[in-house]
Amino acid sequence: MPTPTKGARLGGSPAHERLLLANLATALFEHGGITTTEAKAKRLRPYAERLVTFAKRGDLHARRRVMRQVRDNSVVHTLFTEIGPRYANRNGGYTRIVKIGNRKGDNAPLARIELVEALTVGQQAVSEAERARGTRFEARRKPTGATVEAAEELAQESPTAAAVAVEAAEPAETPAEGAAGKPTTAQTDDSGIGDDSGAGEQNSAN
């Protein structure tokens, strides 16, 4: 069996490693960034950047070379029409790796590998949809420890937080205001005690 020359082998066999890298590259070009183990991210980086170099060429032979590894036609189309032209004036360094700590459970070191420049239009739409799905129920929560001005600024940035600003702007009735018109039990007891003592003094005088 040939010895790997670019780091530890991924998977159980060379064929498994090729399929694993191809799937990771497909996910990277589709979403703009993925979270995986640090070892896989380091092996994926030169693999993905070589495919971006083929996409920058843009000819038919380069497209066929990429399609031997990336089998998703929509991802190949995105790679050649959006990602490749984006790096026309950049010679290498198309991705970055950010370490994000260890995974809970097996304590494997995790890393995020992503494309270095802005997302494409399709990737921005996907990220906005995921963000909207995650903040769908934020309107029911009241801001804790934040001022009304901060809530209004947040409402300008996110439409889903508009209800939060409206709820924060409404003045809440304090318990002191609600109990201002009602005499307390202590006051009632004191007044009753004073009346009984006065009546006792009048009876003794008579």
From Swiss-Prot:
Keywords: Ribonucleoprotein, Ribosomal protein. Residues 130-141 have a biased composition (Basic and acidic residues). Residues 130-206 are annotated as: Disordered. One of its GO terms (cellular component) is cytosolic large ribosomal subunit. One of its GO terms (biological process) is translation. InterPro entries: Ribosomal_bL17 (IPR000456), Ribosomal_bL17_CS (IPR047859), Ribosomal_bL17_sf (IPR036373). Pfam families: Ribosomal_L17 (PF01196). GO terms for molecular function: structural constituent of ribosome. Residues 160-181, 189-200 have a biased composition (Low complexity). Part of the 50S ribosomal subunit. Contacts protein L32. Belongs to the bacterial ribosomal protein bL17 family. This is Large ribosomal subunit protein bL17.
